[in-house]
Swiss-Prot record:
SUPFAM superfamilies: Elongation factor Ts (EF-Ts), dimerisation domain, UBA-like. NCBIfam families: tsf. Keywords: Cytoplasm, Elongation factor, Protein biosynthesis. It is found in: Cytoplasm. This is Elongation factor Ts. GO terms for molecular function: translation elongation factor activity. One of its GO terms (cellular component) is cytoplasm. Associates with the EF-Tu.GDP complex and induces the exchange of GDP to GTP. It remains bound to the aminoacyl-tRNA.EF-Tu.GTP complex up to the GTP hydrolysis stage on the ribosome. It comes from Neisseria meningitidis serogroup C / serotype 2a (strain ATCC 700532 / DSM 15464 / FAM18). CDD domains: UBA_EF-Ts (cd14275). The keyword Cytoplasm applies. Pfam families: EF_TS. PANTHER family: ELONGATION FACTOR TS (PTHR11741), ELONGATION FACTOR TS, MITOCHONDRIAL (PTHR11741:SF0). The gene is tsf. The keyword Translocase does not apply.
Length: 284
């Protein structure tokens, strides 16, 4: 039987990023053959990734990449906020964003396939399920800028614009804070407007106001609704005395489009009863 030295284990750990004991076991199984041991670990890490696939990944980070006139914003999920802060996980998320910007995949499934080897490797290292949840690529003749909020990187935006990068970045910060649904009123679908109009009309009728006054009330509330959900109509968070459209115009800038994400939006997180888990473990 080949002797397994500490240096061999350390070298394999450096090459794979896996635990010392896992690397030692692989070297023993491979009878000291480094390449074979690395192959064994790759196979086992794939099995580990499959084993964890059913667990809910509701934490994570956002990452972006801008490659010339192509930009990508991605959300990559893991199971715990502890792993979400891990440098290796963040590096994986950045790799996913870079891959999305370079390859411009057509779907999450296609992007996931492109990064599957790296995903399995980081799962094997950190022991949590991870997944590419969503992404968007903007391929444009215009300019691009991104803003990721805070050290935890859980909210962010990719902005397509014309004009000043500094102004566009400030507007990106506004988008994260104020959460507009679209850039302008023209992008709000008619069905949404009519639904709101119906609600406001019924409320006005119920208030007993005369028809002409009720009609004016409805139109006023529709204007307010559109201002609240559109970027151009919102009061600019850095100067509420002007709208975002006014701030952009006076600084020679126009926002063409944007995509905004918040990690975990719409994912139902599992509620863990740790007391019950400890009690159950104590009976084993």
């Amino acid at each position: 039987m080949a002797e397994i030295t500490a240096k061999m284990v350390a070298d394999l750990r450096a090459a794979t990023g896996l635990g010392m004991m896992e690397c030692k076991k692989a070297l023993v199984e491979a009878e000291g053959n480094f390449d074979k041991a690395e192959e064994i670990l790759r196979i086992k890490s794939g099995a580990k990734a499959g084993k964890l696939a059913g667990r809910t990944a509701a934490e994570g980070v956002l990452a972006y990449a801008i490659n010339g006139n192509v930009g990508a914003l991605v959300e990559v999920n893991c199971e715990t906020d502890f792993v979400a802060k891990d440098a290796g996980f963040v590096e994986f998320a950045n790799f996913v964003a870079k891959t999305a910007a370079e390859k411009k995949p057509a779907s999450v499934e296609e992007l996931s396939e492109l990064v599957e080897a790296e995903r399995k490797a980081i799962i094997a290292k950190l022991g949590e399920n991870m997944s590419v949840r969503r992404f968007q690529v903007i391929d444009t003749a215009n300019q691009l800028v991104a803003y990721i909020h805070g050290a935890l990187a859980t909210e962010g935006v990719l902005v397509e614009y014309k004009g000043s990068e500094d102004v566009a970045r400030k507007i990106g910060m506004h988008i994260v804070a104020a959460k507009p649904q679209c850039v302008s009123e023209a992008e709000v679908d008619a069905e949404t407007v009519e639904k709101e109009r119906h609600i406001y009309t019924e409320q006005a009728i119920a208030s007993g106001k005369p028809a002409d006054i009720a009609a004016k009330m409805v139109e006023g509330r529709i204007r307010k609704f559109l201002a609240e959900i559109t970027l151009n109509g919102q009061a600019f968070v850095m100067n509420p005395d002007q709208t975002v459209a006014q701030f952009a115009k006076e600084n020679g800038t126009e926002v063409v489009s944007f995509v905004r994400y918040k990690v975990g939006d719409g994912i139902e997180k599992a509620v863990v009863d740790y007391a019950a888990e400890v009690a159950a473990a104590a009976k084993v």
